[in-house]
């Protein structure tokens, strides 16, 4: 039996005792019963009255990342008297999980509700539930209040080392190396001069050539990076909270962070649910996180069709993120290779999400002739995996 049914039953039992005593004409019983029945009824009515007089507003956390615990601030905006055990809880849409409601005291005027951000996204909060006990502690009462608010949960990402040391480049010829796509490039080798700090001596080259050498490095010219995200829904494998598209978003955020940290700029390419392609360029990280938080896999365009709609910057390093590769990608990849800008094709491993036969071995062999290809799985150490992929692709 629910608490509400028990509370109503108690009121009706008291009411029936009062009526019965009145019918059989027992004045003293009528008086006692009416008095005892009026106490909880009065407590209930007063509690409801004061609860409906209370108005709260809510403040949602900013900069919250998927997998973190967040706090929603509930402030009492208006109130005459607070019933005991007053709490406020926002009606959170799934998959957000409320951990503990906010306890409110009129004197303090505010409380914190704890919740867990299970998945990235943009969540609109429309209601809060105010709960309390009556003044006698017999009944539990509650009501809903309309609110308007939006909360953004950013995607999670990893910070990996994007500065690359090409220790072997240019060593044999004792000359300069080719610029890398961001990071540090090998510049030159020269003999150590008297008066310089011994710390600058490269002992490996010294042992090889029999003389003291110094290796000079210079900051490589930063390159922009274009990240194309496949938003085709048929290419999403896994459940609502953990799937290949969510892995793509995490990889995109991580690559964007590394590129910006390395002095470049980032262009995000995707298609919306109407099949309209979008291309947005960024030089700071927070707007990228906000875009990725809002992105959904609802586009009718496959990745190959999206790429046909775009005129991409030839000077930008191109990264393609998908979990549904097919032969239709080969013409685009071949064209980019002929232009001297081989893309980086990152495949989200659908087999790690329970999908078998998601791509063929012959396709993988074909595509390797035109692009750097890497497969990223759910169980991979993403930081180490991206560091290795970045190093391989940057050295091409």
Which role fits each region the language model picked out?
Residues 1, 83, 359-360:
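Accessible peptide chain termini
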Residues 250, 257-396:
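Acidic, glycine-rich A-domain
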Residues 2-5, 23-27, 156, 215, ...:
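Intrinsic-disorder/low-complexity, polar/charged segments
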Residues 38-282, 317-321, 335:
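An amphipathic, basic-hydrophobic helix/alpha-beta surface used to engage anionic
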Residues 1-57:
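Extracellular/lumenal glycan-associated context and N-glycosylation machinery
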Residues 9, 33, 182, 201-205, ...:
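Short coil/turn segments at secondary-structure boundaries
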């Amino acid at each position: 039996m629910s608490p509400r049914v028990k509370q109503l039953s108690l009121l009706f039992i008291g009411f029936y005792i009062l009526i019965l005593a009145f019918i059989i004409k027992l004045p003293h019983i009528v008086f006692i019963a009416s008095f005892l029945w009026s106490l909880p009824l009065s407590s209930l009515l007063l509690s409801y009255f004061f609860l409906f007089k209370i108005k709260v507003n809510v403040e949602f956390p900013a900069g919250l990342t998927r997998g973190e615990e967040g706090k929603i601030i509930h402030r009492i905006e208006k109130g005459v008297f607070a019933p005991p055990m007053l709490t406020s809880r926002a009606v959170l849409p799934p998959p957000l999980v409320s951990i503990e409601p906010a306890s409110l005291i009129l004197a303090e005027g505010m409380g914190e509700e704890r919740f867990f951000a299970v998945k990235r996204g943009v969540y609109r909060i429309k209601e809060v539930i105010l709960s309390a006990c009556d003044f006698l502690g017999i009944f539990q009462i509650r009501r809903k209040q309309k609110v308007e608010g939006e909360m953004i949960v950013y995607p999670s990402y990893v910070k990996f080392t994007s500065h690359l040391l090409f220790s072997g480049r240019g060593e044999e010829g004792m000359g300069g190396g080719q610029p890398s796509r961001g990071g540090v490039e090998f510049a030159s080798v020269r003999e150590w001069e008297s008066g310089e700090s011994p710390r600058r001596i490269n002992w490996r080259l010294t042992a090889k050539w029999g003389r003291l050498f110094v290796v000079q490095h210079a900051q490589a010219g930063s390159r922009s990076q274009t990240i194309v995200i496949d938003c085709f829904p048929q290419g999403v494998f896994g459940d609502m909270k953990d799937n290949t598209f969510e892995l793509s978003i995490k990889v995109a955020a991580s690559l964007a962070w590394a590129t910006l940290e390395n002095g470049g700029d980032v262009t995000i390419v995707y298609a919306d649910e109407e099949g309209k392609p979008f291309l947005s360029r960024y030089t700071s990280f927070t707007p990228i996180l906000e875009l990725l938080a809002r992105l959904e896999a609802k586009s009718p365009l496959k990745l190959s069709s999206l790429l046909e709609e775009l005129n991409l910057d030839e000077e930008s390093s191109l990264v393609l993120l998908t979990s549904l590769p097919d032969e239709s990608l080969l013409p685009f990849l071949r064209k980019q290779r002929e232009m001297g800008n081989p893309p980086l094709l990152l495949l989200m491993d659908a087999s790690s999400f329970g999908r078998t036969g998601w791509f063929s071995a012959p396709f993988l062999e074909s595509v390797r002739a035109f692009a750097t290809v890497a497969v990223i799985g759910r169980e991979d150490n993403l930081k180490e995996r991206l560091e290795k992929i970045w190093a391989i692709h940057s050295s091409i």
